[in-house]
């Protein structure tokens, strides 16, 4: 890591340069110049990848060319948000303790009211080629699919065309005209309506949607069905098991993954281990167990044989390879997953208390779990960033799910004082 003035950020012989990448937000170039200027104050060089993806920065950093990586992005958030994701020399996100130390050092510097240093940057065009070449080499091409791809007016606009062109796919592009302010705006993995409509209109084989920094991907089948991260985990997990490449026959998912995924994996002799929400926790469990596949319903999927983080482009090419090699359509493949009715309710609260101390809430949770048995799930947790209690229920019928989400949410409102 780099820190105080005079520090040199290298580990195990890594170079003395830091890689900087960004998505398409209008504030990106200014922030990149500020980061480079700050590094120059401690005699550390910077290489600028320009517009690239978060997993692209992670890959390039772990090749050993750089001491660390910095991705300037706010992922799926609106254009006016932005932030810094710092990647270690090994390609992983920083540990919480290291992030906290960096934040403390930044706070110390800001308290001194010193003038910031900007450093003009020139994009190194060779870096994207290294990343796209690597992705293309993880699969055996070509792909003869007709695809519709939504780049979310974000990072994928610079990377995806070269990759899918090399792999031979015919692509109709949407969400591929960034202007600095339209990243994630009614497009990308959080807004699948336009993608679904275009897939149906063009009779494409399937559609792919990335988010702003392309660390996640969601899909739309030829019939217009949304194919989420759960479905990808099932298809990839069962494919890896057939190839005898799934250690301990285990897939890592989160508490939000549908019970239908768990049942489908179990039918193939695969255990699903759940973690708290967040790709960070998924990765921690993967490393702990030596698992090679894990992810979230939201489309963050980690193939640890190839990447240290969720990678939307990698997920896309791996899914396409599975579909091609199966000789079936995506619709036919995902038909094996029977999702249980699921409902998520957010309850805005005035204050928090440990859920275990809320007697009436616990009583409702236990009653729901008794009624569902092994045919349902109850997940109640607080948001990590907002004053919300989240109630997620899965069960055999929509009627039962509605009943229990309503009862548990009402108990939370009574205990913690609902707002609004």
Over which residues does each language-model region extend?
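Proline/glycine-rich low-complexity loops and linkers
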Residues: 40, 100-133, 137, 221-295, ...
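N-terminal small/polar loop signature for handling phosphorylated ligands or for N-terminal nucleophile
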Residues: 17-81, 162-220
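Short glycine-rich phosphate-binding loop at a beta-alpha junction
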Residues: 15-23, 47, 146-148, 249-255, ...
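Phosphate-binding and adjacent anionic-ligand microenvironments
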Residues: 206, 243-420
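An N-terminal, well-structured beta->alpha segment
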Residues: 1-37, 41-42, 122-147
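Short glycine-centered, acidic/aromatic-flanked micro-motifs in structured strand/loop junctions
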Residues: 20-24, 149-151, 221, 305, ...
């Amino acid at each position: 890591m780099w820190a105080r003035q005079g520090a040199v950020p290298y580990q195990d012989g890594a170079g003395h340069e830091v890689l900087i990448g960004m998505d398409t937000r209008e504030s990106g170039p200014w922030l990149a110049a500020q980061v480079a200027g700050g590094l120059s104050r401690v005699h550390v060089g910077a290489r600028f990848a320009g517009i690239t993806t978060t997993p692209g920065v992670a890959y390039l950093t772990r090749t050993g060319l750089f001491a660390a990586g910095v991705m300037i992005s706010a992922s799926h958030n609106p254009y006016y948000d932005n932030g810094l994701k710092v990647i270690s020399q090994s390609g992983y996100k920083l540990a919480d303790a290291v992030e906290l130390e960096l934040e403390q050092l930044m706070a110390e510097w800001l308290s001194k009211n010193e003038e910031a240093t900007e450093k003009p940057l020139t994009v190194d065009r060779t870096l994207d080629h290294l990343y796209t070449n690597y992705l293309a080499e993880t699969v055996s091409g070509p792909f003869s699919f007709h695809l519709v791809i939504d780049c979310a007016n974000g990072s994928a606009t610079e990377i995806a065309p070269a990759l899918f062109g090399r792999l031979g796919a015919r692509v109709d592009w949407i969400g591929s005209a960034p202007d600095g302010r339209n990243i994630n705006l009614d497009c990308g993995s959080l807004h699948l309506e336009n993608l679904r409509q275009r897939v149906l209109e063009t009779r494409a084989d399937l559609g792919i949607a990335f988010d702003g920094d392309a660390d996640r991907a969601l899909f739309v089948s030829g019939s217009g069905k949304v194919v989420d991260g759960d479905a990808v985990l099932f298809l990839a997990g069962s494919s890896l098991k057939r190839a005898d490449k799934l250690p301990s026959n285990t897939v890592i998912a989160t508490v939000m993954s549908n019970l239908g995924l768990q049942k489908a994996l179990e039918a193939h002799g695969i255990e699903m281990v759940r973690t708290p929400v967040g790709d960070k926790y998924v990765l921690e469990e993967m490393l702990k167990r030596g698992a090679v596949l894990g992810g979230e319903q939201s489309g963050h999927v980690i193939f640890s044989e190839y990447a240290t983080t969720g990678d939307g482009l990698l997920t896309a090419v791996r899914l396409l390879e599975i579909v091609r090699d199966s000789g079936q359509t995506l619709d036919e493949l995902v038909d094996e997953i029977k999702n249980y009715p699921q409902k998520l309710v957010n309850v805005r609260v005035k204050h928090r208390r440990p859920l275990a101390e809320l007697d009436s809430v616990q009583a409702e949770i236990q009653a729901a779990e008794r009624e569902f048995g092994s045919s349902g799930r109850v997940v109640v947790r607080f948001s990590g960033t907002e004053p919300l209690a989240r109630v997620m229920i899965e069960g055999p019928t929509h009627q039962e799910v509605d009943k229990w989400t309503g009862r548990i949410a009402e108990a939370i409102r009574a205990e913690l004082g609902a707002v609004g």
